[in-house]
Amino acid sequence: MQVLKTPESAFIKITDFPYPPRFTEITDTVSGEIRMAHYQCGPKDGHTVLLIHGEPTWAYLYRKMMPVLADAGFNVIAPDLIGFGRSDKPVRKEDYSYARHVIWLKDWFSQATKGPVTLFCQDWGGLLGLRLVADMPERFSGVMVSNTGLPTGDHVPSDAFIKWRRFSQDVAVFPTSTIIQNATTTVLDEATLAAYDAPFPDESFKAGARMFPILVPTSPDNAEAQANRQAWEKLKQYNKPFVTAFGDSDPVTKGGEKVFQKLVPGCNGMAHTQIENGGHFIQEDQGERLANLLVQFIQNTQLK
């Protein structure tokens, strides 16, 4: 499998993400070894908080949340998914599948984290992170979800999603930072936009970003739709603290929190929040507020 590595020089102008990358060699039965990056801050002996990004971002998305969590005494870990950030980027679209992303993330998680973990996830961070919670519930002491879901293909996708999926495949130049800007309520400055473009020096680096939209299960007979149904059966038994914090300005996932609140027993009695002026990339719009909510959630439910 041919893999690209974004040169470190691509990241040199980023001044607001001071965390050095740490690399983990992970394997699967098809690709052999592949390298996944993550970033750490806060006391390493603190309670671990795992922050998983989605499409088409990288751990830089969490730069507003990480210092707040670290100052609260948590061991903060934010990975770059394969195909994103400083992680390796397989060249062929065929090298990416939902199942393989789960395998990659699970291998990395088993190596890079220890003890009980609180998960925060958004977008594809939920499609992947919640599969880990379902498969390894003993490793997770709590979960906060924002602007995400775990689709089973049993509902017709929206016209907006169908257009987005088609766009992701047909557009000649995949406009990473423009996609992010169009899904926030705040205006991002040039340095921030450049930081989101940094992992992708040219189109050959973007196979993973182009693939995520078509890996979302949109029909009931999709293999990963069945895997997600099985994951939901396990989440229906998850009775540890589970809270939702969705944005009020994200048309993609609006109302999705109700599914979690209805089906996951750990949601009962939790202080669920709708975040004002929170677009799809809510970490950009309301990062500090989200981080403070996450601190309160952990302190009130998991560290008593």
Q: What do the predicted segments below correspond to?
A:
Residues 1-26, 36-41, 48, 61, ...:
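Flexible "cap/lid" subdomain of the alpha/beta-hydrolase fold that forms the substrate-access gate
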Residues 29-33:
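Short, solvent-exposed loop/turn segments that connect beta-strands within catalytic domains
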Residues 46-53:
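Short beta-strand element of the alpha/beta-hydrolase
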Residues 54-57, 123:
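Active-site glycine-rich loops that stabilize anionic/oxyanionic intermediates
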Residues 64-68:
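Typically the conserved alpha-helix immediately C-terminal to a functionally engaged Cys/Sec
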Residues 278-287, 291:
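Catalytic histidine-centered segment of alpha/beta-hydrolase-like enzymes
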